[in-house]
Amino acid sequence: MRLFNERVAANLIQSRTGLRHHMNAITGNNLFSKPRCESDIIFTASNGDLECLKEKLLSHDLYGAVVNVRALQVFMEAHVFAVWDFMSLAKSLQIALTCTQLPWFPPEDASSARFVNEIILNEESDLSQEGQAQSHLEMYLDAMKEVGASTAVFDNFLFLLKNGKEVEEALNLANVPEHIARFVTETLNISMGGSIVEVASYFLYGREDPIPDMFNALINRWDVSDLSVNKLRWYLDRHIELDGDEHGPAAQKLLQQVTRGEPDKIRLANCAAQNAIQARINLWSGILQDIAALESTSAQ
């Protein structure tokens, strides 16, 4: 069992490293360079630095800018990329914490494996409003169509990926805005090149922990009829329910398990947490600028 797990871990590291080196060769080591931690922060819920970053994210001006359907369309046309790349983080955890190769062997930590598999189950094949199995990405795309948001750029990006283009090239050819491209590439860099500690921390602090508060902030401040955004409202409420009640606490426990109280791993988790939150702030700021530019053009 130990030999098998070590072999699987080695293959995963080799695969991730190879992908990262290949991406760096394509990009000139710019977009796909590993995020640098500007300062170490203490990995505790009460830490001032981490709480300050989280507060900056949750008080972002973007939530107050999504006040009409056109602004919501701009938001969704960017946010769909975050909905998509979420699965790369989740799949990275699944590869590391469960057995995804043949022959199958039991995972070392069944509780962690169960948590990750539940995430995958919900994200890849949750039940829609109509009771049909559907991925959360598909639900989000349906919600975009309901509010009149364009899926053209995202659809083209996925088409290019499916037809063999590398991520960097697909982002460029699909004309994905830079702030979105940087968010996606940082997520994929962590997913494919990060350690299990980095991925688990990025997953918790960049996704599971802030999502309920972010989505609540959006819902509480928008000025659009719920009837016109029925599918989006259902999607947001579903994530608030799952991430707030189940996935968030489980992701916190998972991170504690993989760090094991070891100082080096805690520092690694700290750095990943900081980078994850800052990446989201940068994405929000880019979307806010797009909305402001739209309003400026409309006023002329």
Where are these regions (language model features)?
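N-terminal amphipathic/basic-hydrophobic helices that include classical n-h-c signal peptides
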Residues: 1-27
